[in-house]
Amino acid sequence: MVIKWSRFLVFCLIAFSLFIWMNTASSNASQGWKDFYKLPRNSVDVVFMGNSHNFETFQPEVINDLIPMESYLLGTSGENVMVSYYELKELLKYQQPRIVVLETFALDLSDLLAPSLMYEFLDASILNPDKLDLWLNYFDLKDAYNLFPALRLRIDWNQPADFFDSFIKTPGSYFNEIDERRGFLPTGRVMLPQEYEESLRLPGRESNYSLENNTHYLKKIVDLCRENDSQL
C-alpha cells in the first residue's frame, strides 16, 4: 500500500512539474514583466506605465545614464487605464517608486484593443486575486482554463520547432540577466500621414466599456500613489 501511494505521489509530482514547465514555455508574458520579478525589492525610483505609446517611447537605459536614478518601464499592448491600475497594484507589492509616470493614451482608450493582450501581464507570475479580478472584467468563468498558458496553447504542428526550442530553454530562462532595455521595445513601424488620416475615419469598435470607467480607475491610481508616497 505504501509503495502504491509513493508511486502515485511521484507521478503527481512529475505531472505537476511538467505542467509548470509547459505553462512557462507557452507563456505570453512580456520580457519587461518577466524581468520585473527579478529586480531587487524597492530598487526602482521611477516607473513608466502604459501601452505601446509608453514602451516604444521612454528608454530607461538612457534615462538612467542621464539622471542619477533607477527607472523601469511596464505595460502591455493596447492597455487602458483599468489595466494600468491593476499593474500598479502588482508593482507596489515589490517596489516603492518615488515617481509613477502614466502615459495619457491609456486614458483615451475606451477599452482594450484586444483583451487577450493582457496575458503579457497575467502570465508573468503566479495568479493572485488582483490578477483574477482584472481577468474577470473581460472573460467568463467558463473560460477559466485560459488562465493557464499550457491549456490555451495551440502548437503549429507545421512548424513546431519554435515551441520545442522555447520548451528546452525554459529552465535556463530563470537565470538570464535582466534585459538592459528594462522594458523598452524599439519599433521600426512608421505610419505615413495618409495612413493616419485614413485611420481616423475607421469606425470604432463596439464596446460596453464607458470612458467614465477610465476616470474611475484614474482616481484609484491617484489614491494608490498617495497611499504609497509616490508622485504621479
Ranges and model annotations:
Residues Q31-K34, E56-F58, Y86-K89, H216-I221:
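Alpha-helical scaffolding within the catalytic cores
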Residues S43-V44, M69-E70, Q96-I99, R226-Q231:
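Loop/turn elements at helix/coil->beta-strand transitions in domains of secreted/extracellular proteins
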Residues M118-S230:
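Secreted/periplasmic serine-hydrolase-like ester/acetyl group-modifying domain
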Residues K4-T24:
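Hydrophobic membrane-insertion alpha-helices, especially the h-region
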Residues V44-V46, L73, R205-S207:
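A short, structure-level motif marking secondary-structure boundaries and short turns
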Residues M22-N28, M49-G50, T76-N80, Y209-L211:
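Short, flexible loop segments at the rims of nucleotide/cofactor-binding pockets, characterized by
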Residues M49, H53-L141:
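Membrane-embedded segments
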Residues A25-V44:
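Alpha-helical transmembrane signal-anchor/signal-peptide segments
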